[in-house]
Amino acid sequence: MAMAALTSSSSAITLLNKPFLPNRSSFFSSDSQSPLLRFSASTSVRSRFPSAAISAVAPKSDINKNETPKIEIEETQVFACPVCYEPLMRKGPSGINLQAIYRSGFKCGQCNKTYSSKDEYLDLTVTADLDDYNEVKPITTELFRSPLVSFLYERGWRQAFKRSGFPGPDEEFRMAEEYFKEAEGGLLVDVSCGSGLFSRKFAQSGKYSGVIALDYSENMLRQCKEFIKNDNTFDNSTNIAVVRADVSRLPFPSGSVDAVHAGAALHCWPSPTNAIAEICRVLRSGGVFVGTTFLRYSPSTPWIIRPFQSRILQSYNYLMQDEIKDVCTSCGLTDYEDYIQDSFIMFTARKP
């Protein structure tokens, strides 16, 4: 991102000819005298997302060992406000890992909405921190917000998918990795991640600059965090973040994500068209989307019962192969491919 140079006559920082930190002293300044501002722009070799960082440090003559360490403020290209899609300003340690995200605060410079980590996840929903309003989703979404279903998901629930033709997590992961080869080294978002079954696999592979485990269910994210904490292959440097967000309002800037994965998820979304349109928006040019779901009926389903089965399952967003392709292409994705096994379908498409 192009940045205007800092001038010696003003403490304002200008980004694309707009004030970067206008009148936000209460959120980003200390109680002591105004610090000097040091600007740096950096781009990671493995990441396509440059960031602007500002370090607030005291003048050299005032530095002593007892003073508070410098405060870092960053406009990140990873997260955006789910209300206005402006990049969020971040106060705290940098990095996409559990410890850094937990210790950071986020604020939108456009609408002034603030976001912070709960005990287990960063809440980037439009309804974050609302006290009196509780949004209820369709039953297919609300089911997975249940503590019981969230607990059982990797303890028997997911294993039952094999009866519908799902190959199993290890094989599904291997298949997805084949489609994601061109996205290696970039940012991967695992939408509707559930308890993080595939998010953990993607993070453990070490092939991505960051992995975002994203779900709307608070209890699924608690399970995700618990599995990560109990896995000794993860440490504070592992590039994985746990985020609560709505798939139809993804908290990422347009064109900023290299890969999106949605395992056994499409049939749970209130509006698959809205969700896939959002996925297309956040993908960069050439970015890859891979998803799996249940078909309304399998190729082996007797023709005589297909109309009845279709009538029942269509209301729960169980789609067919041609419908999934139509939704992807109508939302701007190209190069659609799929693989079908019984009622299981893995499909992929990319942003041109």
Curated annotation (Swiss-Prot):
InterPro entries: Methyltransf_11, SAM-dependent_MTases_sf
Keywords, comma-separated and alphabetical: Chloroplast, Methyltransferase, Plastid, Transferase, Transit peptide
Presence of keyword Plastid: yes
Domain of life, per lineage: Eukaryota
Transit peptide (first-last residue): 1-55
Pfam family, one: Methyltransf_11
Sequence similarity: Belongs to the methyltransferase superfamily.
Single GO MF descriptor: S-adenosylmethionine-dependent methyltransferase activity
Protein name: Uncharacterized methyltransferase At2g41040, chloroplastic
Compartment list: Plastid, Chloroplast, Plastoglobule
EC annotation from Swiss-Prot or TrEMBL: 2.1.1.-
GO CC aspect terms: chloroplast; plastoglobule
GO BP, one annotated term: biosynthetic process
